Each structure stands twice: as structure tokens, then as C-alpha cells.
Amino acid sequence: DIKVWNLSLGSALEIQNNFISPEAALLDEIQFEYDVLFIVAGTNKRISDKDGMKIGAPADSINSLVVNAVDKNNKPATYSREGNVLSFFNKPDISYYGGDKKDKMRVCMPNGEYFVSGTSFAAPWITRKAAYLIHKIGLSREVAKALIIDSAISWVKPNISSNLIGYGVVPRRIENVLNTTDDEIKFVLSGESLMYDTYNYNLPVPIVDEKHPYIAKATLCYFPKCSRNQGVDYTNTELDIYFGRLNGKKIVTVNDNKQNDNVALPEKEARGMYRKWDNIKSIVEYVKTNGRAKKAYENGLWGFSLKTKERLNNGDGKNLRFGIVVTLKEIKGVNRISDFISQCSMRGWLVNRIDIKTMIDIYNIAEEDIDFE
């Protein structure tokens, strides 16, 4: 089955402020119903167009992975159009190299070599990476999407608007999407939201001198059912993520998420701070020069909790699949991955390393034709 589809096309007109385009709504419906992923170009601005021009349909598709373009210096291309969508959803999602000005992209045309630029040429590179992760490495589309977005998120606070580059620029090499540096622990969690609270409180993170010397990053992706006739209240299901150290039965969240603490929290703040009703959620602690280790509680366990909330019909979020990518960065640069794997195994986790060469060998052997004489 073909699970990854590239759409290098788009409208010259801007998206509307208060409702999703029919084309984008159809893409969102298809991705909710079927196990597929659309990669959509972020559309281009012409020289004659105004500054700050919004993206065009179908780049307002919430479930799709929307790609804008940057130049070779990771700066937004001069033809970039801007998000966000419905004044809230972060679009584009990511950026990649699409050529610009004198540094155009070299392609093969029917008449030979040609030099081009545009988001239509950036998107296929991301499509290739997504297809590689899903078809060759064997990851789910939720995890694949989360990995690609997570790889674009820097430990340093960005100085370019997310309306132009999304969560960041995806690395050129697929190894840098899957692999980590020696001072990082990266793991993926996937599953389905079977009830109101889907959780695990049994993540053993290595302790050093009764502290956790890490900063953390987590990226959540899922594909909710959407309702175009709801206007700005477009997504039907919210997965509210809580991730951090476990103190008794309570998670001390990395991003201080208080949505479940019975405190007064306006909807605008919940959306802005915790991305409520967004199908992509990123939690990140940026590197600080005076960063300190965190206190370790009890057995040094961390946990996560996903609370499922419905806007319209009970059941829209039932069996909704999700993918979470978690990265822990050691603040002193020490490699603690072996200790982490050992502790996970002792607690009953089945830890499978993602080895690119091994997965490719398995894929190639599975694709071989066998002749029975």
C-alpha cells in the first residue's frame, strides 16, 4: 500500500481566516479515515504579491505535513508565504531546502538539466524521508511525522517566526532524523487512546547524585477527526499531554501544564501555552547557560499521561492512534543511554534500538523474489 503522498500544488489565493478550505478538509478527512500521510507544499509568493501573504489551499490542511522552503543558510525563502491557520494552528509545520535566488535547486527536466526554486521542490524531499521511515524502517505514520517534526526542533530558542518556518528546518540526512548525539537519550512511544486517561508511570530515567541532569523535549502527533462546519473549532478531539518526573501519583510536568489542576485557565491561554486542540504538541526546554539538574523523586521514574477530550461526539477520539518522541539531553554532555536501556529492561520494557542498516537489510531480504524449483 502507498501510505505517503506528495502534493506539490496550491492556490494563488490566500486561505480564509475563519474556515478551512474544502480541499484541506477533504485531506483531513482522508487522513482520519485511512492510514495515509499527505505532504503538502506551503505555496509560493510571487514578486508582485504583498508581504506577509498567507499560504494557499490545501496548505491549511491540519492533519497534513505542510512544508515551507528555506535557502542554503536556513533562512526563509524570499517566496515564502505565511501561516497560521484559523488564527491558531501552526502552519507550515516544518521547512526544507527549496532553492532561492542564485542558489536554485538542480533538477532533471524532459530537456535536460534545469534550475528551479519553490516549496513544490522542498516538499518531495520530506515525502522521501517520511516514506523511508514508514516503508523501510517500519514506523507508524504518527511516529514518522513526530520524528520529522522533532528533528526540526532545536534546543536553542528560534529567532525566526514559526509562521514562516514552522517548528524548524529538517536535517538533510535521514540519519540525523533517527540518530541522536552521544549526550542524548531518545525514545518513541506509540499507542491508542482507549479511555479518558492513557498513561504510563514507569519510565526509569538515570539518576546522578539524586538528581536528573537533563533537559527534555517531547513531540506528540495524532490525526483527529475534523469538522469544517465548526469554523475555528475545527478539530473534534484533544489529546492533552502531561510529561515529566513522577512525584507520588502526580506528574511534575516539564511545561508546567495546569489544565487538569482545577485552576482558572482561559481558553486563549490554554491554546497558546499548551496547544489545546492542536494535533501537534511540542514541549521543549531550551539550553540555558546556568542550567541545573532536576530533583529526583522516589525511584527516579518519569511518566506521561494523555487525557482525551471531545468537542462534539463521544467516541470521535476512541482508538485514536498517537506517536510521541521523547529526547533527554544530558546537561554535562555525558552518555547515559546504556544505563537507561538497562533500567528499562529491568522494569520489563522491551527496548528495540532503531538500527538503520539492520532495518534496510531486513527490508531488502523481505522484498527478494524466491523461485521454487
Protein language model annotation of sequence segments:
Residues 213-216, 285-315:
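Noncatalytic modules at the cell exterior or secretory-pathway interfaces
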Residues 229-283:
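Surface-exposed beta-strand/loop patches in noncatalytic accessory domains
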Residues 213-253, 310-373:
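Exposed low-complexity, polar/acidic, P/S/T/G-rich flexible segments that act as propeptides
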Residues 53-131:
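Extracellular S/T/G-rich loop segment that most often corresponds to the catalytic His/Ser-adjacent loop
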Residues 11, 42-46, 70-72, 100, ...:
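Acidic, glycine-rich active-site loops and adjacent beta-strand->loop/helix elements
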Residues 1-57, 116-117, 121-122:
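Substrate-binding/access-modulating region of protease and related hydrolase catalytic domains
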Residues 137-215:
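C-terminal subdomain of the subtilisin-like protease fold in secreted/lumenal serine endopeptidases
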Residues 33-35, 61-64, 85-91, 136-147:
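Subtilisin-like serine protease catalytic core
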